[in-house]
Amino acid sequence: MKIVFIGGRDIHILGGIESYMLNLATQLVKMEHEPIVFCESDHNGEEFVNGFRVIHQKGFNSNLICKPWLGLKATLKTIRHIHDADIIHYNAWPPSLWSPIARLCGIKSLMQGHGLEWQRSKYSPTQQRIMKFMEWLTAHLNRNLIMCSEDQCRYFKKHYNREATAIPTAIYL
């Protein structure tokens, strides 16, 4: 199965999503799948890491626009150049805004939620309202939802009447 991951930062600068994609893609290669990872980076280019293809896309200094823009670029590149992709795995809502385009081209997709971003105190009230709207939009645009916690699944069921599957990606200490 050819699985395209869209939505992380540079895979060499390990954060939560990046570590998750690196480890999952590495295991998928061992199971004879073909993962392809698009990541935000400080340069454009391609490389192979642990047997899977990594496509670096240069981002720019606007968090509000950068991730949706890179999600669109990665979705279009998948449609145009990765003709036999079986599924696109979007990490978080910004890149998943383009999942309807993938579906129109016959590619299945899923969106993995990594938290309720608008609740984080680091964002201004205006940013929180925009994120809340984007969450609503994501809930309605994406057909297949997975979340990192049961709490997020319950939230999406309660507020959007959307079923989501919980797949915890962290470790338990």
Identify the residue ranges that each predicted region occupies.
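A short beta-strand/loop micro-motif in the catalytic core of glycosyltransferases
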Residues: 88-89, 140-149, 165
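Extreme N-terminal starter segment of soluble prokaryotic enzymes
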Residues: 1-4
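Carbohydrate-associated surface elements
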Residues: 151, 170
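A short, histidine- and acid-enriched strand-loop-helix "catalytic/donor-clamping" loop
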Residues: 62, 97, 110-127, 141-144, ...
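A short, charged, and often flexible helix/loop element on the N-terminal side
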Residues: 51-77, 118-127
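N-terminal strand-loop element at the rim of the active site
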Residues: 6-14, 20-21, 27-65, 152-157
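An aromatic- and histidine-rich active-site surface loop
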Residues: 69-75, 80, 87-118
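Membrane-proximal helix-turn-helix segments that form the acceptor-binding/catalytic region
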Residues: 104, 127-145
